[in-house]
Amino acid sequence: MAFINYNTKNRVTIFPGVHSAMEHSSQITYGHVHLDEGTVVPIHDHIHEQWTYIVEGKMEFTLNGEKQLLLPGMGAFIPSNAPHGAVAVTACTIIDVFTPVREDYKNKE
């Protein structure tokens, strides 16, 4: 699929407060993600490299024990197996890109 309208694409709940419209290629998972205000993404890690980009809202992001307030236009690169988590200070829209593909997310669709 070459063209996608994420405004109308079905979203799946990754876990409470985190809702994503996802696409998967052979090597990448792309997520257009909404987080409800106050949502806590607990500290976790995974084998995937991850890019997170803030489209709108405010997110307190923790990476390797360091906290940073991310605002629109800001983002983070999360290396493989790096402990990270977040708190949605406000409702947020973010872009998440993972490699390799998040097979576990495919199973949620």
Task: Give, region by region, the residue ranges found by the protein language model.
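A short, N-terminal "cap"/entry segment at the start of jelly-roll beta-barrel domains
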Residues: 1-27, 107
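Conserved short histidine dyad/triad with adjacent acidic residue
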Residues: 31-45
